[in-house]
């Protein structure tokens, strides 16, 4: 949960389940429960071109005679895409013409896709915006248990992350935050936001596909990672 390697930067942030602490975001902590029944293996991979002189770790675990039958397992899903704007070009807030609605979720950025039973507990969303244009009008859309039409549709990216009015202020809350905001003109540059569904998980019985538009009706080119 450090800044993505493609950014090659570190910074502090604090949330209830995850944190990156001093110094300069190098103290990484995770408080998600990760049940296992037969065994568990934790690996650390150096994906940089630099040697690691020292690595400190600490793991807490609890031994039980038997896990409850309904105990789930913890899963994380990574995705990274350079999205494509509409053929007619980029626009936002209808500046260069009327914007059509997106009713199917086609061409949305996918941040979660899985089969089986479970509940969604959170997302780290990294956006590298190549222009000063506001990146956050894309709606989140959730396809639960094989839905063709999403039953949950949001009202904008910043709304999905519990904020409003195009924020550019660093902020951390136990369940949502903007630990890294762009420092260039408009919204040009890198922004990291998160939201954790601890009190309001999204449940599914058969499958879940979580998506979000990149701009209204997917009209922006954005470098997105989750």
Question: What kind of region is each of these model predictions?
Answer:
Residues 1-226:
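Beta-strand-centric surfaces of beta-sandwich/beta-rich domains
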């Amino acid at each position: 949960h450090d800044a993505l390697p493609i950014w090659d930067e570190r910074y502090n942030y604090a949330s209830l389940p995850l944190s990156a602490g001093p110094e300069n975001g190098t103290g990484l902590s995770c408080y998600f429960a990760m049940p296992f029944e037969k065994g568990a293996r934790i690996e650390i991979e150096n994906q940089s071109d630099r040697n690691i002189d020292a690595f400190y770790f600490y793991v807490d675990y609890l031994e039980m005679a038997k896990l409850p039958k309904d105990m789930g397992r913890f899963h994380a899903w990574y995705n990274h895409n350079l999205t494509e704007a509409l053929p007619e070009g980029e626009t936002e807030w209808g500046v260069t013409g009327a914007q059509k609605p997106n009713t199917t979720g086609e061409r949305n950025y996918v941040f979660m896709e899985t089969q089986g039973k479970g509940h969604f507990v959170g997302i780290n969303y990294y956006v590298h915006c190549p222009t000063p244009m506001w990146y956050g009008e894309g709606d989140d859309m959730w396809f639960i248990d094989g839905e063709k039409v999403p039953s949950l549709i949001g009202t904008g990216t910043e709304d999905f992350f519990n904020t409003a009015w195009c924020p550019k202020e660093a902020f951390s809350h136990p369940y949502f935050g903007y630990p890294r905001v762009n420092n260039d003109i408009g919204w040009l540059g890198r922004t990291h936001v998160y939201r954790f569904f601890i009190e309001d998980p999204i449940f599914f019985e058969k499958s879940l596909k979580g998506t979000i538009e990149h701009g209204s009706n997917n009209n922006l080119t954005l470098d997105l990672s989750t």
